Amino acid sequence: MSITTMKGVTSESPAEALSRFQTTGLTLNNPKDLYWMTEFLKEEFYDKGNYYYPIKTVCDGELIETELFCPFEPKLSPHYIQLYNSRDERSNLYAVPPKKTDMKKYNRINCEKMGSLMAPNSNYDDTEMVSLFYSMMYYLNDQTAHLKLPEEDIQPELVDELNDHVLQYLSVFLSIFKPREPQDLERIWNFLDFYQPYFKKVDGKIILHEKYQGRTPPQIGLIKKITGYVLERFAPKKNITQVIYEVIRYIKGIKQEIKIRGDKSFTLSLKEYDEFRDQVTSSPMAHSITDLTYDDFSYKAYMNPLFIKLEDLTSEIITYFNDVCTCDRERLDDDPFNSVFILRDLHSLNYVKSCDLVVKHAHDKLSKFLEIKQTLLKESTNENEKKAIAQMIKTREDSLIGYTIHEICCVTNGYARDHKPLMKDYLEKNIFKKLKATN
């Protein structure tokens, strides 16, 4: 596909798209526009061997102009338009009746966009499920938002309520877990860690103690939609242990975040920050779903220390890209969980230089990612294993470039957590120029 052949996807020629853009500008509330932006970035950067993508934003009045290195091919799912157009129906999952979903918040999360960019090769249902996992992460994470308040303003009952909700969510995920091997049961049981006392093992399953069964928490419809799909689509033929593992990892990370946020005097080194963020990045959950969609699947890869390192690097790179793009919002929120702030304080830098340093660290991590990729492929013992590992690595590569494009294309306020007017101006200027040249 190219800019000149986009009509097969968007049902509009370059001339028709240009005419529309000159009236509306680039937006995120017309799903066609994301195809034009993605294809433009692919042709102007990836196809020309330039893997440095521009980011233009502002932090505390400082102009941030940097480049995110990501040497993988940008692609948007062919199902994105259909996913976007069915979002009103999907939004019903996010509130317990009679309450209704806050569409302002739902639009800002824009999970269909993330899923379609970060899992572009999956079928419709699988792409929807990846999107739902990303939205689950945002909704769970937002339930810790009140912990950013001054310590004296934090309401203990809200902390208890969040813990109750988390137990219900964990219980639903564990209800679909039917271990194929005894070691799978023990792996999950041991990984529950400080949540273990709330659960018990009964007939090869892990269930929540009756006394902790609470009232129906928000987003339970979302959780049941995800677990029902995993149970029907994957559990009969494949080992779903990693899905459960990654959900527990993320939820444990939220608990750790609560603990850290409770200590307003905390400091983190960059190494400690990486280790913490490895636990509270949603991409491993989404990857565990996408991995299952392929015939070539290796559960034992998750036990390989090198593959675990590759997964962690993916999380860290996405986190660093996110930190650069969200630093102004998080500065205004007085949220210290950001590598830009850590390096700024450590080296007495301004925001511009700190962002540049974060981007450099991300580049170094991506170089390490590529080294590990080659080692994993070289060490594969047979062709089937090599094919499975290659596909699982490709899933992580798709996430990295998908997240990069996601941040670049935040061009509509209210349809992105971090609207970027400067990127909107950049994309409109260059896409309009390219479309005019095709006429």
From Swiss-Prot:
Keyword Coiled coil: no
Keywords: Magnesium, Metal-binding, Transferase
Pfam family, one: Terpene_syn_C_2
Pathway(s) where this gene product acts: Secondary metabolite biosynthesis
Superkingdom, taxonomy of origin: Eukaryota
UniProt-listed Enzyme Commission number(s): 2.5.1.-
Top EC class for this record: transferase
Gene3D superfamilies cross-referenced by the UniProt entry: Farnesyl Diphosphate Synthase (1.10.600.10)
Binding-site residues, Mg(2+) 2: E330, F337
Cofactor(s) for this UniProt protein: Mg(2+)
Positions contributing to Mg(2+) 1 binding: N322, T326, E330
SUPFAM superfamilies found in the cross-reference section: Terpenoid synthases
GO MF entries: metal ion binding; transferase activity
Membrane-spanning parts: none
InterPro entries in the cross-refs: Isoprenoid_synthase_dom_sf
Impact after mutating M114T: Increased affinity for geranyl diphosphate (GPP) leading to an enhanced catalytic efficiency with GPP as substrate, but reduced activity with dimethylallyl diphosphate (DMAPP)
Catalytic activity line of the entry: dimethylallyl diphosphate + L-glutamate = prekainate + diphosphate
Role played: Magnesium-dependent glutamate N-prenyltransferase: part of the gene cluster that mediates the biosynthesis of kainic acid (KA) and derivatives, natural products with neurochemical activity acting as ionotropic glutamate receptor (iGluR) agonists, thus being neurotoxins. Catalyzes the conversion of L-glutamic acid (L-Glu) to prekainic acid in the presence of dimethylallyl diphosphate (DMAPP). Can also use geranyl diphosphate (GPP) as substrate, thus leading to the formation of N-geranyl-L-glutamic acid (L-NGG).
Family to which the UniProt record says this protein belongs: Belongs to the terpene synthase family.
Stated name of the protein: Magnesium-dependent glutamate N-prenyltransferase
